[in-house]
Design a protein with these regions (language model features):
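Hydrophobic residues on short alpha-helical segments
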Residues: 596-604, 628
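Short amphipathic alpha-helical interaction segments
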Residues: 622-633
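Charged low-complexity interaction tracts in eukaryotic proteins
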Residues: 633-672
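Short helix-capping/hinge SLiMs at alpha-helix to coil transitions
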Residues: 603-608, 633
Length: 675
């Protein structure tokens, strides 16, 4: 057996993803299946598999990543409970999931428009008491019930081994103290002070930190000790895993707070309700900052005297991903070893950060060189500018250009399909990416697809990517002949590489590619009906709660009923439908090329009356030739497109979208919108 020196440490980092958390959950689900199967093989056939150990020491999450990290840690401590896949082929992966609580939390429950007679979903209207002001567009109350249900561990099946949450043996692939970091966007802020010498009354610089986090330590989950000084000295709340909630039984306040904090990290602004957090000022006094330097200092805040006396600190939290959406620095700091050089080479590395990111795409970068900006241009750019700057991490640039760094790995969506020259990667890999991540709540099939894609991508990552060099000490200590069984040959480097986590048992059976999901027009119509009901319920209450003048309130209500509601719902319809068309997630009798779908989606989208080739070229990743060919393809469909000259420009539009004669000659309408 490998000794304590042959332990490879892992820090998981899970990026924010809204409904695409289903993908991250699938990745984590398969990761624990692979670790479990490997441990069984080490126990039963020790001479046939790699004998080093892996220790997951920390999991850091933002937004949806926080929910996945928090729920998965408890679920795995309650024991793997494999669920059979529907009609698996011979030789294929037999399981749909091994952590059903995670599957239920991300796939089954969080729907926008449930088919149930008495729906409890994100568009239900039971979250507002009479006269109360709406806290969010969607009904976030369902998420509270969902998290509570997912955290509650069901009784053990007959004959199952006793897991750590039920007093059984700790897991050999987790740390004794599993650290969970959840990022928060603190609406109140935490005050800090930097002293300067000078002659003024205030000798220093005051700052307010809104990028907050919660730190939980789950005790008794795994077997591995040896955490570093930074981690052991960082303030946090300890929870014994044997006190984890049980299904159908009330949980204590500490565990309720654990689930509530995970939800607070995922409180997407406006869409989902902000969450209240109450903690102790002492949590900030010994807090460590996750910088890469070896310094383990704390920087206490400059609290007002009143707060120092009360010791309690309460604030409202928004989505942690607003400020820190990829919290890999916490995972990185957690696995650094005291007194040792941070080795990153293929044959010297002793641990790694594994980041799971469903949306790794870069922020939009404008190719336009503008010389002036209107007030509206400034307002439109302000939020993305502040968000991107808040997420910028200069410390990470220090190692950004080190291509030989084997201590940073990423799992992100990849979906291959058959092409004319072999397999090709689809532009849209995940089904929950509709509407920037909210669209996964439109239908369970979207989330189910991404959960399985996460499992499939994780399997490929462990098999083909996550590795060390052939001269690594762990590999040299493997039993005779094992390295010949578990390896990949890199033709370019002319080297063998060996897996950090080998695939054995059921984990070696391939996870099949899930079928790409689509919804039909009837399902879309039902979703839009529910959106109308939700809007009819929420908007008048929002108007009434923020308008103290009765006459203004009545006028605003009339404007909404007579004009605003239909206008808004038309925009919502076209926005949803366009994104579904673009991503090939709406059933259609016609099959279009990728380029034609992109153009068709833009023609259908709200915002313009008429489109030009130049305008389409500007907003799409296509060039002008591709746009023109796509328009030619669409023009082959009878009664689909209109084309003609408008204001001396060659324009296109969907025939059903072309303004009628009355609309075109409306004196209050203004110039047609062309782009």
């Amino acid at each position: 057996m490998a000794d304590d020196k042959n332990v490879y440490e892992i820090g998981l980092a899970m990026a924010g993803a809204i409904s695409a958390g289903a993908y991250s959950a699938g990745v984590v689900d398969f990761l624990f299946q692979a670790l479990h199967e490997w441990e069984l093989a080490k126990r039963d056939e020790p001479d046939t598999v790699p004998n080093h150990s892996v220790c997951i020491r920390a999991a850091a999450g933002a937004s949806a990543g926080s929910i996945t990290a928090a729920l998965a840690a408890v679920a795995v401590a309650g024991g793997l409970r494999p669920q059979k896949a529907a009609n698996p082929e011979v030789g294929e992966q037999p399981y749909q999931c091994v952590l059903p609580a995670l599957y239920k939390a991300w796939v089954t429950l969080p729907d926008m428009a449930s088919a149930a007679t008495d729906p409890k979903d994100l568009l239900a209207n039971d979250d507002l008491k009479d006269g109360a002001s709406p806290q969010s567009i969607l009904n976030a109350a369902i998420l509270t019930a969902l998290t509570g249900e997912a955290l509650g561990l069901p009784d053990l099946p007959n004959g199952a081994e006793t897991p750590p949450a039920f007093g059984g043996a700790p897991l050999p692939y987790l740390a004794k103290r599993l650290h969970i970091y959840l990022t928060l966007s603190n609406m109140r802020g935490v005050p800090y002070f930097v002293g300067f010498e000078g002659g003024g009354e205030i000798r220093g610089h005051h700052m307010m930190c809104h990028g907050d986090r919660a730190h939980y330590i789950l005790e008794g989950v795994g077997t591995h000790g040896g955490e570093n000084t930074w981690l052991s000295g960082d303030s946090g709340q300890s929870l014994k895993i044997t006190t984890a909630p049980r299904a159908g039984k009330p949980s204590d306040k500490a565990w309720e707070g654990y689930g509530h904090t995970a939800l607070a990290s995922a409180a997407f602004p406006v869409g989902l309700a902000a969450r209240s957090i109450e903690t102790d000022v002492g949590q900030y006094e010994t807090r460590k900052w996750p910088r890469l330097s070896e310094t383990a200092k704390s920087y206490p805040p400059r609290w007002p005297e009143k707060l120092k006396e009360s010791k309690k600190f309460a604030f409202m939290s928004l989505d942690g991903g607003l400020i820190d959406n990829e919290p890999f620095e916490y995972a990185r700091r957690a696995i650094m070893r005291d007194g040792e050089k941070d080795e990153t080479g293929e044959s010297t590395v002793k641990g790694a950060v594994v980041m799971i990111d469903p949306f790794p795409e870069p922020p939009a970068f404008s190719l336009k060189e503008v010389q002036e900006a209107s007030i509206f241009d400034v307002v439109r750019a302000l939020f993305p500018m502040l968000k991107n700057q808040a997420r910028f991490k200069p410390d990470a640039l220090a190692t950004a250009f080190d291509n030989s760094n084997y201590s940073r790995w990423m799992i992100s969506p990849s979906r291959t399909v058959a092409g004319t020259h072999g397999e090709k990667n689809e532009r849209y890999a995940i089904a929950t990416g509709v509407l920037g991540g909210f669209g996964g709540f439109l239908d369970e099939s979207f989330r189910a697809h991404d959960y399985q894609l996460g499992r499939r991508n994780c399997q490929k990552f462990l098999r083909d990517v996550f590795s060390v060099g052939e001269d690594h000490p762990y590999v040299r200590d493997w039993p005779p002949g094992v390295a010949d069984k578990f390896h990949n040959y890199d033709k370019e480097a002319k080297k063998f590489y060996h897996p950090v986590i080998p695939l054995v048992g059921t984990a070696a059976l391939p996870v099949p590619a899930p079928q790409w999901p689509r919804i039909d027009q009837s399902r879309l119509a039902e979703i839009e009906r529910r959106i109308r009901l939700r809007a009819t319920y929420v908007v008048p209450r929002l108007i009434a709660s923020k308008n103290r003048h009765k006459l203004l309130s009545v006028a605003a209500g009339r404007a909404w009923s007579w004009y605003g509601k239909d206008k808004l719902l038309k925009v919502v319809h076209r926005t949803i439908e366009s994104d579904l068309i673009r991503r090939d997630q709406l059933d259609s009798e016609k099959s279009f090329s990728v380029e034609a779908r992109e153009v068709l989606a833009e023609l259908n989208a709200p915002g313009y009356d008429y489109r030009t080739v130049a305008g389409l070229d500007e907003v799409l990743y296509l060039n002008k030739t591709q746009v023109e060919k796509a328009l030619e393809e669409l023009e082959q469909i009878p009664n689909l497109l209109w084309s003609g000259e408008v204001n001396s420009q060659k324009c296109w539009a969907l025939k059903v979208r072309v303004p009628g004669w009355l609309e075109r000659h409306d004196p209050f309408r203004g110039e047609p919108r062309i782009g």
